[in-house]
């Protein structure tokens, strides 16, 4: 089952959405300085811009589609100019269709300049944070908004702190296994539809649920199960990093399956290589316990660099080496 699908991305977000939501997820508060229709202004890029050169008159290559940040340098430059020069300098900025302007460090904009921005329909905000912190917070928020994402059919479970993505053909019991893991004390992130995001150029993948399905599960023969209502808040997770993919396969006696674990496999998810474990399914096999061991193996490798198959191989090699040294005597 291939997971290497092309990621999707938002084309833009409205300034209204940006203003209403950034304070809920990030440590920054914006205050409106004028009243314009923020729904008509859209942000198309995650990157921000400080328009120092544009204010001085050089507008070649001006990235006006970005959020414009006016810090101490820009506001003091405007304030030291005469009234006519100041208006001319600010016109070099507002004559372009910029999404919005953010003043940092509680800087003030002259009333005539604020009126110019309002006439052009440009929202102006102010924050008490410094330019450095404001740029970091706004960029991080826009990184989230413009991150690559894709929806996958499967189940996502937090097992011992390890994000395990269960995939496979319909009817193999992914939801039943996820439910069994929840009953054993682990946390459900998503079932049936798993939304996976890759933020910026990061190699980290975060999985979350579909907001409509939420933490409901469909179990064949039983119906819909509300995991949060049945098992409590401890049984659910909002977001989890994808650390391993467990693919459930129909048992095929003609197919050779991994027996030692020396041949490590991986699969690409949104361009990121993720460890892959393929598990054949047949009656009587306790997949839930195996998934727990898969998660524990990830922890062992991550924190102790320990792989059981390699440890066993090294032990066998040592026995053979000792055997050759003692001319046939078996060393235990």
Curated annotation (Swiss-Prot):
Mg(2+) binds at residues 175, 218. Its EC number is 2.7.11.-, 2.7.4.-. The active site is at residues 153, 174, 192, 259. It catalyses: [HPr protein]-L-serine + ATP = [HPr protein]-O-phospho-L-serine + ADP + H(+); [HPr protein]-O-phospho-L-serine + phosphate + H(+) = [HPr protein]-L-serine + diphosphate. ATP binds at residues 168-175. Catalyzes the ATP- as well as the pyrophosphate-dependent phosphorylation of a specific serine residue in HPr, a phosphocarrier protein of the phosphoenolpyruvate-dependent sugar phosphotransferase system (PTS). HprK/P also catalyzes the pyrophosphate-producing, inorganic phosphate-dependent dephosphorylation (phosphorolysis) of seryl-phosphorylated HPr (P-Ser-HPr). PANTHER family: HPR KINASE_PHOSPHORYLASE, PROTEIN YJDM-RELATED. The Walker A ATP-binding motif also binds Pi and PPi. NCBIfam families: hpr-ser. This is HPr kinase/phosphorylase. It comes from Chlorobium phaeovibrioides (strain DSM 265 / 1930) (Prosthecochloris vibrioformis (strain DSM 265)). The lineage of its organism: Bacteria, Pseudomonadati, Chlorobiota, Chlorobiia, Chlorobiales.
């Amino acid at each position: 089952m291939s997971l290497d699908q092309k990621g999707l991305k938002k084309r833009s977000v409205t300034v209204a959405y940006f203003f209403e939501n950034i304070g809920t997820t990030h440590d920054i508060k914006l205050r409106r300085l004028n009243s314009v229709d923020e729904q008509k202004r859209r942000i198309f890029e995650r990157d921000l811009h400080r328009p120092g050169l544009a204010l001085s008159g050089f507008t070649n290559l001006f990235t006006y589609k970005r959020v414009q940040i006016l810090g101490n340098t820009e506001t003091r430059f405007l304030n030291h100019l005469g009234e006519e020069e100041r208006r001319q300098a600010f016109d070099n900025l507002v004559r372009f269709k910029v999404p919005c302007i953010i003043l940092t460090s509680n800087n003030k904009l002259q009333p005539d300049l604020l009126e110019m921005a309002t006439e052009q329909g440009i929202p102006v905000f102010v924050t008490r944070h410094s330019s450095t912190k404001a740029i970091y917070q706004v960029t991080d928020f826009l990184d989230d908004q413009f991150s690559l994402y894709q929806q996958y059919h499967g189940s996502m479970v937090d097992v011992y702190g390890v994000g395990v993505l269960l995939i496979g053909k319909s009817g193999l019991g992914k939801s039943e296994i996820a439910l069994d893991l929840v009953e054993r004390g682990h946390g459900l992130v998503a079932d049936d539809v798993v939304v996976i995001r890759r933020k910026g150029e990061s190699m980290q993948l975060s999985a979350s649920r579909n907001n409509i399905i939420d933490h409901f599960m469909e179990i064949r023969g039983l119906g819909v199960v509300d995991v949060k209502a049945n098992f409590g808040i401890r049984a659910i997770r909002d977001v989890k990093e994808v650390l391993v993919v467990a693919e459930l396969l129909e048992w095929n006696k003609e197919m050779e399956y991994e027996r030692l674990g020396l041949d490590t496999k991986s699969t690409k998810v949104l361009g990121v290589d993720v460890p892959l474990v393929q598990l054949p399914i047949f009656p009587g096999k306790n997949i839930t316990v195996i998934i727990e061991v898969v998660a524990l193996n990830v922890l062992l490798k991550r924190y102790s660099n320990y792989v059981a198959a390699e440890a066993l191989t090294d032990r066998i090699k040592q026995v053979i080496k000792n055997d050759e040294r003692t001319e046939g005597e078996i060393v235990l």
